Amino acid sequence: MDALRNAPAIVIAEGYATAGSISDGIAAPVVAAFDSGNLMAVAKALHDKYPDKAVIVAGDDDQHLLGNPRVRRNVGREKAEMAAEAVGGKAVFPIFAPGEREKDCAGFTDFNDLGTKSKFGMAAVERQLKPAIEKAITEKVKELERNKQQERSRSEGMER
């Protein structure tokens, strides 16, 4: 937990391999939720423990499930977006090279696939996530500053 305490932001991935690839790509700790259904609980627990940190949920984009008659939902994207929204965080999803998803939609869903299967490779993991993390940190800092200012204004109003 020291690594998370010292990290500039909390990054959460759905699976272990994805968390590993992201950690390698951004050179920072990443938490694996192990299942899309667990993203919400993990995001809330970490947000409660580290309320001053930006939360980024690096989600799976399960487009292939849209064609499955039993599912017909992009579960990975839905769960990641819900978890991020619940903690005021940001959900991010990998962007693949043109044509890669068309050849194997189920094989190109997450940041591990981006780093290990895409022609863009691990450099793309860094290129796609670092700006998203930096933006989330900047937004979190602004939010904290607004909250402090509002608190000061309330305190000054009570003293009068």
List each model region and its residues.
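Glycine-/acidic-rich phosphate or pyrophosphate-binding loops and their flanking alpha/beta elements
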Residues: M1-A7
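Conserved beta-strand elements of the Class I
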Residues: I10-I12
